[in-house]
Swiss-Prot record:
The keyword Iron does not apply. This is DegV domain-containing protein SpyM3_1478. Keywords: Lipid-binding. Residues 3-280 form the DegV domain. May bind long-chain fatty acids, such as palmitate, and may play a role in lipid transport or fatty acid metabolism. Hexadecanoate binds at S63, S91. Pfam families: DegV. PROSITE patterns: DEGV. The keyword Nucleotide-binding does not apply. InterPro entries: DegV, DegV_C, DegV_domain_contain. PANTHER family: DEGV DOMAIN-CONTAINING PROTEIN DR_1986-RELATED, FATTY ACID-BINDING PROTEIN TM_1468. One of its GO terms (molecular function) is lipid binding.
Length: 280
């Protein structure tokens, strides 16, 4: 039996830990438009160039979800397909993936396919994909993998830290005045993905050190006691080190992985920000 894990670019991972003929990973890119320029969030995207273009532009950046056909092409060629998308509250990607699922089943009624709305993005999606890989490599049945990943999703969370809010201002979600104050006072916005997949602000912290303390406080409130962590960061390895050191000082056995945000997640996190997934 062959497997595919299919995600959109709300997931930061470019590949699995160990790919094989039996298990393949497909990442279906969203696109980002800045003025007249279009950036496809695939492996060839120069994220630094995209971010520079974004900050130089006075216009709002918009994202477009993959077409159902793009998902359908990614689904083909496996007996078992598990699909995961960025939260449906931020993108139409989940709906495109659902339409493609229906088309695939019309083409091939014998294929096993399961679609998951991550209700999240970035680090939490990354954790979920890594767990999917682990479960599949255990040799479990399709039904058992679906059962276990559904249970696992109830035990993962997303927390984010924003160091810049240019996109929120350009998209009209924050006033220019508030945006300037945040920049001048070196304020970090700390928030989370709710259980409905919306992004909620939790705290405002002045400076990175206080933002790390706020993050630790919030994940402990959610029930964190040393589970796995995946930190997806936008050009900020320093905050990854600070968070890792703090978590390790409290929970020495915690397994912490870090990586750079995808183009889409860089757009949401902005320079210096992060989207961290963790287990409770």
């Amino acid at each position: 039996m062959t497997w595919k894990i299919v995600t959109d670019s709300g997931c930061d991972l470019r590949s699995l830990t160990r790919q094989s003929k039996e298990l393949r990973f497909e990442r279906v890119p969203l696109t980002l438009q800045i003025g007249t320029e279009i950036f496809r969030d695939d492996d060839g995207l120069d994220i630094d160039n995209m971010m520079t273009t974004m900050y130089q532009s006075s216009k709002a950046t918009t994202s477009s979800c993959p077409s159902p056909e793009a998902f359908l092409q990614a689904y083909r060629g496996a007996d078992n397909v598990i699909v995961m998308t960025i939260t449906g509250t931020l993108s139409g990607s989940h709906n495109s993936a659902r339409l493609a699922k229906n088309e695939l089943l019309e083409e091939n009624p014998n294929v096993n396919i399961h679609l998951i709305d991550s209700l999240s993005a970035g680090g939490e999606m990354d954790l979920l994909v890594l767990e999917l890989e682990r479960l599949i490599n255990l040799g479990l049945s399709f039904e058992e993998v679906v059962k276990q990943i559904t249970a696992y999703q109830q035990k993962t969370r997303l927390i984010f830290v924003l160091a810049k809010v240019d996109n929120l201002v350009k998209n009209g979600r924050l006033s220019k005045l508030v945006g300037k104050v945040i920049g001048l006072l070196n304020i970090r916005m700390v928030g989370k993905a709710s259980n409905k997949g919306t992004l909620e602000l939790l705290q405002k912290a002045r400076g990175q050190k206080k933002a790390v303390s706020a993050l630790i406080e919030e994940i402990q409130k959610e029930g964190y006691v040393g589970g796995k962590v995946y930190i997806a960061h936008a050009q900020n390895p320093k905050i990854c080190e600070q968070i890792s050191e703090k978590i390790k000082s409290l929970y020495p056995d915690a397994v912490i992985q870090t990586g750079r945000t995808s183009g889409l997640c860089s757009f949401y996190a902005e320079d210096g920000g992060l989207l961290m997934g963790y287990e409770i």
